[in-house]
């Protein structure tokens, strides 16, 4: 079972342009791949404005600019791992509403599809996937496209 803490902290956005809790939960469910996630799983999705995402991006990644999504994976303390009592929390996703909307418009993508992509992308990061080198990026993008296709969305990496 997935326990999703869904937070909307962005104040100057049209709530009609934000995904619902139910949509996010559906996207999270299909993006969780790891065998260890068979039981209870907890994560947070926090929708923020540009100021908050820029501050987090600067403080945690050294990049003083906005971004679409930040992933903060949770690592169980070694003492809990040793005891076999790992917590089900996998981490936090922080997604900037304005950046997602701007990207969807600029890339001529349906807003809902881009939100789905950002949630799935972030969930894959929480599970250890990355796109630092080309091989990792190819694998991650292919998996994102496959998951999105299963949900009925076009690949975010193919242009019309």
Curated annotation (Swiss-Prot):
Keywords for this protein:
Cytoplasm, Endonuclease, Hydrolase, Metal-binding, Nuclease, Ribosome biogenesis, rRNA processing, Zinc
**Family annotation (SUPFAM superfamilies):** Metalloproteases ('zincins'), catalytic domain (SSF55486)
Q: Which Pfam families match?
A: YbeY
User: What is the first-listed, main subcellular location in coarse terms?
Assistant: cytoplasm
Q: Which cofactor names does the annotation list?
A: Zn(2+)
- The UniProt record gives the binding positions of Zn(2+) as 121, 125, 131
List the GO biological process terms: rRNA processing
Could you tell me what the cofactor note in this record states? Binds 1 zinc ion.
Compartments annotated for it: namely: Cytoplasm
**EC numbers:** 3.1.-.-
Q: Which domain of life is it from?
A: Bacteria
What is a single molecular function from GO for this protein? Answer: RNA endonuclease activity
Listed GO CC annotations: cytoplasm
Record's family? Belongs to the endoribonuclease YbeY family.
Tell me, in a sentence or two, what this protein's role is.
Answer: Single strand-specific metallo-endoribonuclease involved in late-stage 70S ribosome quality control and in maturation of the 3' terminus of the 16S rRNA.
What is the official name of this protein in its record? Endoribonuclease YbeY
Q: Which organism is it from?
A: Hydrogenovibrio crunogenus (strain DSM 25203 / XCL-2) (Thiomicrospira crunogena)
């Amino acid at each position: 079972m997935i326990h999703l803490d869904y937070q909307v902290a962005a104040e100057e956005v049209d709530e009609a342009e934000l995904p619902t809790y139910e949509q996010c939960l559906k996207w999270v469910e299909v993006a969780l791949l790891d065998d260890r996630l068979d039981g209870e799983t907890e994560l947070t999705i926090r929708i923020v404005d540009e100021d908050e995402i820029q501050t987090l991006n600067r403080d945690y990644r050294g990049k003083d600019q906005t971004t679409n999504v930040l992933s903060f994976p949770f690592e169980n303390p070694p003492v809990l791992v040793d005891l076999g009592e790992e917590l089900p929390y996998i981490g936090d996703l922080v997604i900037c509403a304005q950046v997602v909307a701007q990207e969807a418009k600029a890339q001529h993508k349906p807003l809902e599809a881009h939100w789905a992509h950002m949630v799935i992308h972030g969930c894959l990061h929480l599970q250890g996937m990355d796109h630092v080198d080309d091989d990792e990026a190819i694998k991650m993008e292919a998996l994102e496209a496959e998951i999105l296709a299963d949900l009925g969305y076009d690949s975010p990496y193919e242009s019309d």
